[in-house]
């Protein structure tokens, strides 16, 4: 697909004279364009749901969720991956973000990195990609060689693959088994796909990882019951989670958390089923860590 024919490279009539307007009007133009992004994502919700189900199936079987991107797309994948361990208590290697150019590229532009097909393949080889893993290629343009080659390699291994782009019929979309293509239109600043396209990608990634965690029993109601308390704010959040899930008071919640080494799931089952920490943990283990199953089946 030629660059000049891509929707993400088109000219936006709404911002044609944005350099001549007041600061407030400039903000309004950008905000009006941003409002269209959730609607674009809404139109591809069935595709997102299908991807979540596949990701969950693979991860449940011992696989990983691998994000692969360059520039903004790569950084968004790393951002999403890095938030999963503290939020949901998963091991750091379960959700992995790879960016063209490596760690240096997180904060700096690396010349030619996104054009390296070898880079995409080698980065996946370096994490010992297996057929159990799911590779999600992220590229606003849908034409990034680093991402396309990575998806091709992943499919050769037998991996399930997802392609996220903002141009219909792109190489990323056609290479991946599952395509998620929110069409956000031309950017306010022509070609600056870190804006609307980047926002759309972030919304999609939020759904992929959050959907995976919900289906994996990491959420009870709407509470992040596997949160790891790495700071004072999260210690307080743990107490509030146990309170909200059980109806107990703060003192009871804290006592239960202390008794089970600050595991929210165990504390919740302890309070709701009137169990000690060991028995609560045992029952959770018997039901794969799903609080709902412990409560519904016992």
UniProtKB/Swiss-Prot annotation:
Record keywords, A-Z: Carbohydrate metabolism, Lyase
Top EC category: lyase
All copies of domain SIS, residue ranges: 55-218
CDD domains in UniProt: SIS_Etherase (cd05007)
Active site: 83, 114
Pathway: Amino-sugar metabolism; 1,6-anhydro-N-acetylmuramate degradation; Amino-sugar metabolism; N-acetylmuramate degradation; Cell wall biogenesis; peptidoglycan recycling
Assembly, per entry: Homodimer.
HAMAP family: MurQ
Protein name per Swiss-Prot or TrEMBL: N-acetylmuramic acid 6-phosphate etherase
Biological source species: Shigella boydii serotype 18 (strain CDC 3083-94 / BS512)
Phylogenetic placement of the source organism: Bacteria, Pseudomonadati, Pseudomonadota, Gammaproteobacteria, Enterobacterales
């Amino acid at each position: 697909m030629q660059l000049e024919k891509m929707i993400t490279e088109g000219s936006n009539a709404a911002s044609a004279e944005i350099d001549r307007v007041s600061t407030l009007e400039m903000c309004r133009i950008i905000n009006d364009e941003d409002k269209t992004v959730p609607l674009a994502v809404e139109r591809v919700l069935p595709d997102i749901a299908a991807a979540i189900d596949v990701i969950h199936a693979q991860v449940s079987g011992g696989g990983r969720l691998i994000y692969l991107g360059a520039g903004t797309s790569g950084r968004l994948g790393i951002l999403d991956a890095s938030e999963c361990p503290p939020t949901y208590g998963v091991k750091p290697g379960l959700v992995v973000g790879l960016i063209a150019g490596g760690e240096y590229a997180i904060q700096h532009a690396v010349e030619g990195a996104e054009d390296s097909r070898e880079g995409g393949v080698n980065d996946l080889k370096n994490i010992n990609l297996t057929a159990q893993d799911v590779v999600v290629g992220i590229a606003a343009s849908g034409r990034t060689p680093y991402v396309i080659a990575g998806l091709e390699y992943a499919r050769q291994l037998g991996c399930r693959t997802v392609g996220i782009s903002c141009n219909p019929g792109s190489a990323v979309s056609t290479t991946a088994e599952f395509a998620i293509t929110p069409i956000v239109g031309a950017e306010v600043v022509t070609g600056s796909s870190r804006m609307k396209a980047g926002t759309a990608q972030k919304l999609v990634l939020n759904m992929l990882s959050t959907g995976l965690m919900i289906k994996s029993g990491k959420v009870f109601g709407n509470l992040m019951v596997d949160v790891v308390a790495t700071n004072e704010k999260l210690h307080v959040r743990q107490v509030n989670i146990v309170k909200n899930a059980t109806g107990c008071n703060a003192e009871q919640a804290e006592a239960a958390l202390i008794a089970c080494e600050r595991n929210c799931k165990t504390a919740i089952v302890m309070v709701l089923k009137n169990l000690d920490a060991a028995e609560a943990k045992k029952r959770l283990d018997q039901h794969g860590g799903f609080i709902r199953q412990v409560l519904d089946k016992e």
